[in-house]
């Protein structure tokens, strides 16, 4: 009973801390408001036009709709799509806010969203909506910053989880029959023939781009930064070596 009470206390403390993370909550609220608005437009018959205007596509970028690289992240195709991304933003975003502050959280999310969008334009197809690129950036950034952390309930290290996600998304991106990659796309075609076409309806290229951006950001943060003191010590070492 004491153990259970302790667990509940820890959970309550965690929820109280997460409730004080403004950037994560702000993103979730904006996503919800945008989805409510787009669903209203769908009901009035204007939904497709707005999705084509704000969702990301090669055609849209060719027509000069450069805002799509940002706006696609705020749109979602359905309530389940929105719900999954909102929960992940809440879980991962609030953790990053606690670790590094709201600016870092917003920066990682936005850069991941942009990187995911660019990778979709390069390797994906169709209309892209959703903040999945930002979510993947948060996930892989946290996994790279804390590689030895255990991920529950999976019981594996964050490092191995991150590697598995990146490899999986790379394989699924290249296996998409629409991409036409030699050999590997034929495997994707076999999956489609066996009733698994829905696998390629997800934005795997977007996930891959966002995840890679998260890793790059984390590695940059982990790299030792030069300071005046470090430069002074390096100069003294070079001077000592030159006198020998």
For the regions a language model picked out, list residue spans one by one.
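C-terminal transmembrane module of polytopic alpha-helical membrane proteins
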Residues: 1-32, 36, 103, 118, ...
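Helix-boundary and loop/linker segments of multi-pass membrane transporters
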Residues: 16-20, 57-63, 155
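Interfacial/capping segments of alpha-helical transmembrane domains
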Residues: 40-59
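Juxtamembrane membrane-interface segments at transmembrane alpha-helix termini
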Residues: 41-42, 62-63, 120-124, 143-150, ...
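Central hydrophobic cores of alpha-helical transmembrane segments
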Residues: 109-112, 154-169
């Amino acid at each position: 009973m004491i153990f259970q009470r302790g667990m509940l206390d820890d959970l309550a403390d965690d929820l109280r801390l997460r409730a004080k993370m403004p950037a994560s909550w702000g993103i979730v609220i904006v996503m919800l408001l945008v989805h409510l608005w787009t669903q209203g437009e769908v009901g009035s018959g204007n939904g497709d036009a707005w999705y084509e205007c704000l969702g990301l596509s090669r055609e849209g970028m060719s027509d000069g709709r450069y805002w799509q690289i940002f706006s696609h992240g705020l749109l979602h195709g359905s309530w389940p799509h929105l719900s999954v991304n909102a929960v992940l933003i809440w879980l991962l975003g609030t953790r990053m806010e606690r670790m590094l502050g709201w600016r870092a959280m917003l920066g990682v999310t936005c850069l991941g969203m942009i990187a995911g969008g660019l990778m979709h334009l390069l390797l994906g197809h169709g209309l892209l909506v959703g903040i999945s690129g930002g979510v993947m950036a948060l996930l892989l950034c946290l996994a790279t910053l804390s590689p030895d952390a255990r991920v529950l309930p999976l019981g594996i290290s964050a490092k191995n989880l991150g590697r598995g996600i990146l490899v999986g998304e790379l394989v699924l991106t290249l296996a998409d029959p629409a991409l036409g990659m030699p050999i590997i796309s034929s495997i994707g075609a076999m999956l489609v023939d066996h009733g698994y076409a829905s696998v390629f309806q997800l934005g795997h290229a977007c996930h891959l781009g966002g995840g890679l951006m998260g890793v790059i950001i984390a590695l940059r943060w982990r790299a030792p930064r030069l300071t005046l003191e470090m430069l002074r010590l390096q100069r003294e070492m070079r001077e000592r070596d030159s006198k020998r």
